Amino acid sequence: MNDTSDIKHTSQLTSGDFTEASEPFALFAAWFAEAVASEPNDPDAMALATADADGLPDVRMVLMKGYDTQGFVFYSHIASAKGRELAANPKAALLFHWKSLRRQVRLRGPVTPVTDAEADAYFATRPKQAQIGAWASKQSQPLESRFAFEQAIAKQAAKYIIGSVPRPPGWRGWRITPAQFEFWHDRPFRLHDRIEFRRTAPDAPWTKTRLYP
């Protein structure tokens, strides 16, 4: 086994006491704004965890494409592993980890598809090459070679030389509506700050609890 126990870690203190926050969405918005200003790459990247029919978890990085008090939105294809797993078990967990700030946010809850209008509106904002790629990619299916993929891209590009590219029928978005948040901030000597928010329904009040690190 490769021993990593001697890796040195540094801690950056927050300005102010985030543990006084009473509402998780406002706290997330404040932390995310700081991450956008501080994180060198992809502050909107989040780990998405789902589970298959046997309960075996899957996790992968995706990009958050929007959030509000209704939830957190991402896009993919219904034929992908995440799409299939969410169809069978529409619950998921997210993790944001901002190394530059020594912070992370975990949340989990039920998942629902966004409306076709929402998906169409977002797809229309994507670069044309990305739109064509969505048509060419049979996401998560076996691929013979990179060359075969490039041929599929060229074939789709030829179809849409002129005009807009419509959204593929299997390409959609999902919204995770949090039932639980946890905000974590690194502190020296592993004496971290952890604050949890829970609610029993989307319109229920939040209950806040401080957790041991």
Curated annotation (Swiss-Prot):
<dbReference type="InterPro" id="IPR011576">
    <property type="entry name" value="Pyridox_Oxase_N"/>
</dbReference>
<feature type="binding site">
    <location>
        <begin position="190"/>
        <end position="192"/>
    </location>
    <ligand>
        <name>substrate</name>
    </ligand>
</feature>
<feature type="binding site">
    <location>
        <position position="122"/>
    </location>
    <ligand>
        <name>substrate</name>
    </ligand>
</feature>
<feature type="binding site">
    <location>
        <begin position="60"/>
        <end position="65"/>
    </location>
    <ligand>
        <name>FMN</name>
    </ligand>
</feature>
<dbReference type="InterPro" id="IPR000659">
    <property type="entry name" value="Pyridox_Oxase"/>
</dbReference>
<keyword id="KW-0664">Pyridoxine biosynthesis</keyword>
<feature type="binding site">
    <location>
        <begin position="75"/>
        <end position="76"/>
    </location>
    <ligand>
        <name>FMN</name>
    </ligand>
</feature>
<feature type="binding site">
    <location>
        <position position="184"/>
    </location>
    <ligand>
        <name>FMN</name>
    </ligand>
</feature>
<keyword id="KW-0285">Flavoprotein</keyword>
<comment type="pathway">
    <text>Cofactor metabolism; pyridoxal 5'-phosphate salvage; pyridoxal 5'-phosphate from pyridoxine 5'-phosphate: step 1/1.</text>
</comment>
<feature type="binding site">
    <location>
        <position position="65"/>
    </location>
    <ligand>
        <name>substrate</name>
    </ligand>
</feature>
<feature type="binding site">
    <location>
        <position position="104"/>
    </location>
    <ligand>
        <name>FMN</name>
    </ligand>
</feature>
<feature type="binding site">
    <location>
        <begin position="139"/>
        <end position="140"/>
    </location>
    <ligand>
        <name>FMN</name>
    </ligand>
</feature>
<comment type="subunit">
    <text>Homodimer.</text>
</comment>
<feature type="binding site">
    <location>
        <position position="194"/>
    </location>
    <ligand>
        <name>FMN</name>
    </ligand>
</feature>
<dbReference type="Pfam" id="PF10590">
    <property type="entry name" value="PNP_phzG_C"/>
</dbReference>
<comment type="similarity">
    <text>Belongs to the pyridoxamine 5'-phosphate oxidase family.</text>
</comment>
<keyword id="KW-0288">FMN</keyword>
<dbReference type="InterPro" id="IPR019740">
    <property type="entry name" value="Pyridox_Oxase_CS"/>
</dbReference>
<dbReference type="Pfam" id="PF01243">
    <property type="entry name" value="PNPOx_N"/>
</dbReference>
<comment type="function">
    <text>Catalyzes the oxidation of either pyridoxine 5'-phosphate (PNP) or pyridoxamine 5'-phosphate (PMP) into pyridoxal 5'-phosphate (PLP).</text>
</comment>
<dbReference type="GO" id="GO:0004733">
    <property type="term" value="F:pyridoxamine phosphate oxidase activity"/>
</dbReference>
<dbReference type="InterPro" id="IPR019576">
    <property type="entry name" value="Pyridoxamine_oxidase_dimer_C"/>
</dbReference>
<dbReference type="GO" id="GO:0008615">
    <property type="term" value="P:pyridoxine biosynthetic process"/>
</dbReference>
<feature type="binding site">
    <location>
        <position position="126"/>
    </location>
    <ligand>
        <name>substrate</name>
    </ligand>
</feature>
<protein>
    <recommendedName>
        <fullName>Pyridoxine/pyridoxamine 5'-phosphate oxidase</fullName>
        <ecNumber>1.4.3.5</ecNumber>
    </recommendedName>
</protein>
<feature type="binding site">
    <location>
        <position position="82"/>
    </location>
    <ligand>
        <name>FMN</name>
    </ligand>
</feature>
<keyword id="KW-0560">Oxidoreductase</keyword>
<dbReference type="InterPro" id="IPR012349">
    <property type="entry name" value="Split_barrel_FMN-bd"/>
</dbReference>
<comment type="pathway">
    <text>Cofactor metabolism; pyridoxal 5'-phosphate salvage; pyridoxal 5'-phosphate from pyridoxamine 5'-phosphate: step 1/1.</text>
</comment>
<dbReference type="GO" id="GO:0010181">
    <property type="term" value="F:FMN binding"/>
</dbReference>
